[in-house]
C-alpha cells in the first residue's frame, strides 16, 4: 500500500475467491463488486455482484491517504448530508466502500495496491474457528503464511 503512488490507495486481494469459498458455500453471498477502469483505477466497489465477472478483486479494508490530500478527504466527509441514507444506511453507519464510491463518483482517483492472499477476513466467530482449525491442520498457509 505504501509503495503504490496515488493520493488514495486501497489494498485489493486478487485471490479473494479462495478465502470467500472457504467461508461461504456461495462466495457471491458475501462478496462485493470491485471493478477496474482502463488505467487500473477502481471505478466501482461495494455493490452486490450479479456474477463473478463483477468482481476483479476484494477490498480488504486497508486504505492510505497521502498527506497532501488528507484535508480534502476530511472535508469531503464533513460536507456529506447527515440526513439522507447511503446505500440504505444512516450516515453514521455508512460503509467505507460507500464512502469510497462517493469519492470515485466525485472524480477522485482511487488506485489498488494488489495482493494475492496474505490477509484473513474475520467477520464471525465461525470464521475465527475455521482459521484456527486450518492452522492446526497445517492448511492455512495457502491463504496466509504465519511464519514469514
Segment roles from a protein language model:
Residues 1-76, 80:
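Conserved core of the sugar-phosphate nucleotidyltransferase
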Residues 52-148:
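Conserved alpha/beta core of the MobA/IspD/sugar-nucleotide pyrophosphorylase nucleotidyltransferase superfamily
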Amino acid at each position: 500500500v505504501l509503495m503504490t503512488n496515488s493520493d488514495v490507495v486501497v489494498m485489493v486481494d486478487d485471490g479473494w475467491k479462495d478465502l470467500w469459498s472457504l467461508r461461504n458455500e456461495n462466495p457471491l453471498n458475501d462478496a462485493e463488486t470491485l471493478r477496474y477502469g482502463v488505467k487500473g483505477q477502481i471505478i466501482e466497489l461495494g455493490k452486490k455482484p450479479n456474477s463473478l465477472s463483477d468482481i476483479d478483486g476484494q477490498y480488504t479494508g486497508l486504505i492510505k491517504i497521502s498527506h497532501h490530500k488528507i484535508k480534502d478527504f476530511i472535508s469531503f466527509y464533513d460536507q456529506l448530508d447527515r440526513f439522507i441514507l447511503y446505500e440504505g444506511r444512516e450516515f453514521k453507519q455508512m460503509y467505507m466502500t460507500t464512502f469510497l464510491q462517493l469519492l470515485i463518483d466525485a472524480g477522485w482517483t482511487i488506485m489498488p495496491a494488489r495482493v494475492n492472499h496474505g490477509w484473513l477476513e474475520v467477520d464471525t466467530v465461525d470464521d475465527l474457528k475455521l482459521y484456527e482449525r486450518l492452522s492446526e491442520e497445517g492448511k492455512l498457509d495457502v491463504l496466509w503464511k504465519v511464519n514469514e
